[in-house]
Amino acid sequence: MKIKTLAMIVVSALALSSTAALADTTTVNGGTVHFKGEVVNAACAVDAGSIDQTVQLGQVRSAKLATAGSTSSAVGFNIQLDDCDTTVATKASVAFAGTAIDSSNTTVLALQNSAAGSATNVGVQILDNTGTPLALNGATFSAATTLNDDPNIIPFQARYYATGAATAGIANADATFKVQYE
């Protein structure tokens, strides 16, 4: 009896496994993976986390930006340089480029234009580690930072800057940056 039961179990197991083995394989398209980067001939490489970053300036009351020259609290952000070779260069500085809000405020980034709901009379100002507002022409570099072998953190700050009585709305801005080694 035990042998008969064991034989039935073995036959059942084989039947189930052969059914699973004969099941159709299905393949579906999954998507696309984009790989982005750059090979550079420079003293350092910009850290991947610094290349496309977002600085959250948060919500600021329009009453705080009620007059020209008023600013919000500054928010810190960093540009990190990795894999530095101090025999190639010993210092690095950064320049930002973007659209200035107007010709009399060349250190204030214009806000992105959205269809409706943008704040007015306000822009974004970028400060270097000495607290100096940086021109947004892509040619005015921050104070130089002395490089170490690895890693190097170059600190900056960003804040809202009122050019008049700010009105409420979305207040986003973009700038690009480049690094100069010496």
Swiss-Prot record:
Keywords, in A-Z order: Disulfide bond, Fimbrium, Signal
Gene Ontology biological-process annotations: cell adhesion involved in single-species biofilm formation
Disulfide bonding pattern of the chain: C44-C84
Record-linked Pfam families: Fimbrial
Main location per the UniProt record: other
Subcellular localization, as worded in the UniProt entry: Fimbrium
Signal sequence residues: 1-23
Keyword Disulfide bond: yes
GO cellular component terms attached to this protein's record: pilus
InterPro entries hit by this protein: Adhesion_dom_fimbrial (IPR000259), Adhesion_dom_fimbrial_sf (IPR036937), Adhesion_dom_sf (IPR008966), Bact_Fimbrial_Adh_Pro (IPR050263)
Family: Belongs to the fimbrial protein family.
Protein name: Fimbrial subunit type 1
